[in-house]
Amino acid sequence: MTRLSVNVNKIATLRNARGGNVPDVLRVALDCERFGAQGITVHPRPDERHIRRSDVYDLKKALTTEFNIEGNPDERFIRLIEEIRPEQVTMVPDAPDVLTSNAGWDVARNYDHLCRLVEQFHAWGIRTSIFIDTDLDNISWAAKTGTDRIELYTEPYAAAYHKDMAAAVQPYVKASAHAHSLGLGINAGHDLNLDNLRYFAERLPYLDEVSIGHALIADALYLGLEETIRQYRDQLAL
């Protein structure tokens, strides 16, 4: 069964908009676990516009499910990973000023850099994942780095879903089958929601994990957090 990791960045964004500690990121993350989330994801950025370094330390002390930290692996990020030692690190090539992650790695162009990162994170006992698009050659290059997993960037799927869902998912079906044949685990994330998640998961039998934040938190405004997580888990219970 595909695991659900809840990205709590949006909770931090809401807190930071007003100051103080409401909503409490740690409490929400622990409630997510209690309500059935199988992991917690954060994406700390240098300007701390949502998740702060202090949040990452607090979460590490308290979480009982898998902790996934994603981000651009600059020196500051690498030091944070060394100190926290999460279960998984997802390497994302986003610039500091982007609103949200909007592209995967060109692995061939960054091959040596990614190889060094994978080797270092493995030395610290951390599972690695490379954020990537569906290009098959790019996935082959990712496998050569020694990474454990890839995370498929799913915004193109979500954007095209209502136009032609079969065509939208097909590149991901091919990509996941290719990755699986190379021994890679497969994660996915970006704009997955209650509308498009089940169809996606049904067609990717090797899908290990999805990380979902924005849509899940938006749904929770109407449904409540516990019911929302239950519904997302239900979409993945294939």
From Swiss-Prot:
1-deoxy-D-xylulose 5-phosphate binds at residues 45, 50, 100. One of its GO terms (cellular component) is cytosol. InterPro entries: Aldolase_TIM, PyrdxlP_synth_PdxJ, Pyridoxine-5'_phos_synth. It is found in: Cytoplasm. Keywords: Cytoplasm, Pyridoxine biosynthesis, Transferase. It catalyses: 3-amino-2-oxopropyl phosphate + 1-deoxy-D-xylulose 5-phosphate = pyridoxine 5'-phosphate + phosphate + 2 H2O + H(+). One of its GO terms (biological process) is pyridoxine biosynthetic process. This is Pyridoxine 5'-phosphate synthase. It comes from Porphyromonas gingivalis (strain ATCC 33277 / DSM 20709 / CIP 103683 / JCM 12257 / NCTC 11834 / 2561). The lineage of its organism: Bacteria, Pseudomonadati, Bacteroidota, Bacteroidia, Bacteroidales.
